[in-house]
Amino acid sequence: MRIKFLVVLAVICLLAHYASASGMGGDKKPKDAPKPKDAPKPKEVKPVKADSSEYEIEVIKHQKEKTEKKEKEKKAHVEIKKKIKNKEKKFVPCSEILKDEKLECEKNATPGYKALFEFKESESFCEWECDYEAIPGAKKDEKKEKKVVKVIKPPKEKPPKKPRKECSGEKVIKFQNCLVKIRGLIAFGDKTKNFDKKFAKLVQGKQKKGAKKAKGGKKAEPKPGPKPAPKPGPKPAPKPVPKPADKPKDAKK
């Protein structure tokens, strides 16, 4: 019996020792294998600069050409704008407009007469007159011509009108229709609908009487129910009842 007990005890001890050894060894991580040393990186070979600086000169020239081109484009753009503005602002005088009329007047002059061409200039039209004056010592024929030419200038374009904000803010006083609208709203007790705070304040300040009426609104109809008792006070004196007149005795007979 003793031998059996000792054998069993020895087996148990061996198993326990093996289990503890395997558990402790499992927690430990295997050591990484030694890494080989990194190979040296190849050195970057920088491009060797040429002895002459031709490349740099070419780049600079190219940049200069670009900037000059841009400046030319800008100048041309500005010049075009100036030309357009000058065309818009240019005012053609009547002396240029009536060149053909003056030549025609001079052509039609008969021998012994001198052409007199006069014109008046205004903002909207040019008025001109062609007359002929006899040269002293020459035969005079009656010849006179008068013409009026009106050059109508196109009317200037008016800028579009800004849309008017009806009944808004401080502009209320300026428009009569807004004032009418205010009075109507106050009369029906609707003084703040569709209006901002400034407008409501303006309404209260300018239309105090209307605002007071608006607070009450429409008078409510009396509800059906018992009438209130009359207030105590001095009773009126009873009216005298008229007595019936005595009938005459002869009437019975």
Swiss-Prot record:
**Segment 3 X 4 AA approximate tandem repeats of K-P-P-K: which positions?**
153-166
Specify where the region named 7 X 4 AA approximate tandem repeats of P-K-P-[GAV] lies, as residue ranges. Answer: 222-249
This protein's record includes keyword Signal: yes
Basic residues bias: where? 206-217
Task: Report the subcellular localization.
Answer: Secreted
Where is composition skewed (Pro residues) in this entry? 225-243
Q: Where are the sequence repeats?
A: 29-34, 35-40, 41-47, 153-156, 158-161, 162-166, 222-225, 226-229, 230-233, 234-237, 238-241, 242-245, 246-249
Positions of the UniProt region annotated as 3 X 6 AA approximate tandem repeats of K-P-K-D-A-P: 29-47
So which tissues is this one expressed in? Salivary gland.
Write out the entry's keywords from A to Z. Repeat, Secreted, Signal
Q: Which residues cross the membrane?
A: none
Superkingdom in the source lineage = Eukaryota
Protein name per the record: Salivary gland SP38-40.B protein
This chain's source organism reads: Chironomus tentans
Q: Which gene encodes it?
A: SP38-40.B
